[in-house]
Amino acid sequence: MSSLPVAAVLSELLTALDCAPQVLLSAPTGAGKSTWLPLQLLAHPGINGKIILLEPRRLAARNVAQRLAELLNEKPGDTVGYRMRAQNCVGPNTRLEVVTEGVLTRMIQRDPELSGVGLVILDEFHERSLQADLALALLLDVQQGLRDDLKLLIMSATLDNDRLQQMLPEAPVVISEGRSFPVERRYLPLPAHQRFDDAVAVATAEMLRQESGSLLLFLPGVGEIQRVQEQLASRIGSDVLLCPLYGALSLNDQRKAILPAPQGMRKVVLATNIAETSLTIEGIRLVVDCAQERVARFDPRTGLTRLITQRVSQASMTQRAGRAGRLEPGICLHLIAKEQAERAAAQSEPEILQSDLSGLLMELLQWGCSDPAQMSWLDQPPTVNLLAAKRLLQMLGALEGERLSAQGQKMAALGNDPRLAAMLVSAKNDDEAATAAKIAAILEEPPRMGNSDLGVAFSRNQPAWQQRSQQLLKRLNVRGGEADSSLIAPLLAGAFADRIARRRGQDGRYQLANGMGAMLDANDALSRHEWLIAPLLLQGSASPDARILLALPVDIDELVQRCPQLVQQSDTVEWDDAQGTLKAWRRLQIGLLTVKVQPLAKPSEDELHQAMLNGICDKDLSVLNWTAEAEQLRLRLLCAAKWLPEYDWPAVDDESLLATLETWLLPHMTGVHSLRGLKSLDIYQALRGLLDWGMQQRLDSELPAHYTVPTGSRIAIRYHEDNPPALAVRMQEMFGEATNPTIAQGRVPLVLELLSPAQRPLQITRDLSAFWKGAYREVQKEMKGRYPKHVWPDDPANTAPTRRTKKYS
């Protein structure tokens, strides 16, 4: 084993660990950094205490532990053990623990000093998983505040040294060049006219015909693996084994894919990107890389995750190609044009930038950090995702201000997804706890194919679910209890209230309580049910509606009875346009879904009035009784605000009046419950109520409703919003006046509409003096003949005004 590439840098690495709290190691997959180096570190006297080795994937963790134990001629659980979500294999003599990501976070939270631990190794850090970034942030905090003697080794196949060195400028960097054989990299774009599965199968079969050795085929997801496997089966010989490899497979099935092919056989391993770096797959000489991957993208707007298929980064293509050169010179066929490969992103985007951060936020709050920016990150968590995480934790009752509530502390202690943790801590007795634990186990590892009915899955007794539920019950300190299907709905509803769904139409479409759309296949048996709880959703790429992956049909009346806290009751009084009156309803709602609507017999006077006000807002002010007097008062107030701005006039534009209906109109609405009643309201008096006595006097003085002309006649002034005020008066009543009268403290002259004895306009003037001296002559000449009994003097500016004819003058 000393011939492994990493052995060449062992001395340098040990010296670095002796001198520095953090060390960076860059070594390709297969260099021995996971399956040999930890044992050398275990024997190093400079490491005081246990070693914790973090492996991001369960299969890798178990394989690494198995391999390390074999090198010691032991079984896992002796010197070397492992811990993962549903499996623990450690003993009293265990000094090296291989753990998965969530397990390491739990260890740090339960014992922040990591008592008895001398070294933590973060393996495959280049994958930049969310949990690895969190673990690094927590460990750096531990080193800074609690354990300056704790050592941290960050290992990676393609270490992003520049970023890490900026973050850890004092950390030594140790580089192992590794050992690999030349790999011929070929490029072949897939035909546009051919289905992806068929084209990949054809290219893979052709590679097998032309070349010897076993082959590793990279595909984006499980669906493609299964379809390509089916296509390949008819294109290969009997000496070729087809071995799928992806995370959801059982550990035994995964091991079949990584072990060497039997003597005289070849194998094709059809894998997701799980096989890029974290696993050593025996016997591979050929690689076919479809150059695609499926990644999860969280949408903070909807709170859902979308799976997208995208081109892999150049770093991933290099890693995939490298798999062909571990044993001998190999060949990698990238199913993409070389020009496209060269335009691909250099590195993959870190999970922390595109993930649901509710679990991370809960972990940070449990750690005592309410501001994530206080921690050390390679990439800061996006603010918008943190806000979405905070909203979810608030909905689950996990927050009290900026800290965890008592319930939130219980949730965080479990180490589960926040929704599942909320469901688990809500259990009030052993049976509820057993039921919640089984639901959580199913939702953590949902069935891959087939029935989308959660109730059907719950009825099965799969060993993995049973094992996980027992582990969760142990965390809850529950020893007994029976899982009961009748308890599923109320338990789910507490954690997934926003995902209660009601059918809309007959084509499998539903609306969620949060307002989003969701859909089932129209042929799915669940689509016959009006109400569902859909805890497992996936945001579609082709449709705005989410896809329901797993759901439970519910009796909504029973659910409301058992979970009354879900329901918001609102009494609504609405305007009935057809009748011109009000109608009252009581609505029971879960989020935006209406559960039940029933007539309300006796709504309160306040509710009736509020409904009337709402109706006015909906229809606008025209439904009110705007008499000429009321309209003129409103115009006077609008003009007063422009002409006398130094006074505090009320705003009476449409928007302001609608916004203040409760102030000026409501006091006059006693007993008004219909459109007819509205039409009877005195709007003039209601508007006058906006002014105190002093302002009423000022308005009547400065912008009067009427003007008294020299003859004593009291004539209404016509106010306009965009034109000057006007006074329509018979010409004879303005004799003796040299200028136009003014209002608003003399600032605004009245436009005079001078009328004939028959009340018809003769002249409109803004300059009475100029009119008497000029155009009046033409008017005089014409009017003398038409109205000889009326006075038409030669000098009107100096003639006494009159309302009479000559006979009475």
Language-model features, listed with the residues they occupy:
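C-terminal accessory/binding modules appended to enzymatic or scaffolding proteins
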Residues: 686-748
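Charge-dense polyanion-binding interfaces
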Residues: 121-122, 250, 254, 426-447, ...
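Acidic, serine/threonine- and proline-rich low-complexity intrinsically disordered segments
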Residues: 399, 432-517, 530-706, 745-809
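Short, isolated positions in well-ordered beta-strands
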Residues: 181, 518, 714-716
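P-loop NTPase motor module signature
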Residues: 1-423, 483, 538, 722
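Extended active-site and interfacial segments that coordinate phosphate-rich ligands
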Residues: 111-126, 136, 290-294, 303, ...
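Conserved helicase core region in the C-terminal RecA-like lobe
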Residues: 102-103, 270-274, 291, 506-524
